[in-house]
Design a protein with these regions (language model features):
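A cross-family "folded-core" feature that marks the main globular domain of proteins
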Residues: 1-283
């Protein structure tokens, strides 16, 4: 490992057989200079940033925030690899360190940033949210401060984003659309639903796929997959609700919801709420 750049005593960039890597370890760069050899045995953690853009963003971040935030983020990334089977992109280190530095400063000033998508995040990404709660514990262990539940939700999105091909703005747009749909459903059916039920989980999962398709990040829905075709006269609330959803998607996102998509949404609403909230159809 040849040192290319030193950020502080504990963090450096090295050339490792032609690959640029970020290495961390207590005192690994102390009294070291660019061009010198770094003993791999002194390195605790190695991160690979695959693009020049990621490397550039890391360098800007390393110059702008205290190294403790990068080190805490490194610990969190290690936890994610260790405690989950998710394929986590190491570039999450950059986004996490940046977010944690801002989140901790907000908490220290007594400022809580609202997260209007928290409910949807907790239910759509249960595994990732649990990992984000572990991340909050690590932040507390190292920095002696608890971040809010809203911040845990934002950390969840960073974890989800590190496992998906879509960028962070697409992810936020997807969750925002799901929230809009749930708000519309709530207007029609009220809040009398078991949000921990398997039926609700299936409904949320379908909304996730629906949102991805509506926003152009997923394939089309085939109505041949429907277990049963339903009649508008039998389920007026469900059809009216879906009409409202389709109009919202068209107005807000300029996307026409197909008949197949509408039929599947109706089926899920009827399965979950029944006729006017009473008589359901079999899942």
């Amino acid at each position: 490992m040849i040192i290319k750049r030193i950020y502080n005593n504990n963090i450096a960039m090295v050339d490792d057989d032609g690959a640029e890597r970020i290495v961390l370890g207590r005192g690994i760069a102390f009294q070291k200079h660019r061009g010198e050899t770094l003993d791999p045995a002194s390195v605790d953690k190695v991160f690979t940033l695959d693009s020049p853009d990621a490397i550039s963003r890391f360098e800007k971040l390393a110059k702008s925030i205290p190294s403790e935030y990068i080190e805490v983020s490194e610990e969190i990334v290690e936890m994610l690899h260790r405690e989950s089977d998710l394929e986590i992109d190491d570039s999450i280190l950059i986004a996490l360190a940046d977010h944690i530095s801002l989140a901790v400063e907000r908490e220290r000033r007594g400022v809580t940033l609202a997260n209007p998508m928290l409910f949807e995040i907790k239910h759509l990404y249960r595994e990732e949210y649990a990992l984000a709660e572990r991340a909050a514990e690590i932040i507390h262990e190292h920095l002696d401060i608890w971040v809010s539940e809203s911040e845990v939700g934002f950390i969840t999105l960073h974890i989800v984003n590190a496992t998906m091909e879509q960028d962070s703005q697409q992810l936020i747009q997807c969750v925002s659309l799901i929230k809009d749909i749930l708000d519309i459903v709530g207007e029609v059916y009220g809040d009398d639903v078991d949000t921990e039920s398997l039926g609700y989980e299936r409904f949320l999962r379908h909304l996730q796929f629906f949102a991805e398709r509506a926003l152009g990040t997923g394939g089309e829905q085939d109505d041949a997959d429907l277990p049963v075709l339903l009649d508008r006269a039998d389920y007026p609330d469900a059809f009216a609700c879906v009409d409202h959803i389709a109009e919202h998607v068209k107005t807000t996102y300029h996307v026409n919801v197909t008949d197949a998509e509408k039929s599947y949404l109706v089926y899920h609403l009827v399965t979950l709420f029944g006729t006017n909230g009473r008589d359901g159809c079999d899942a």
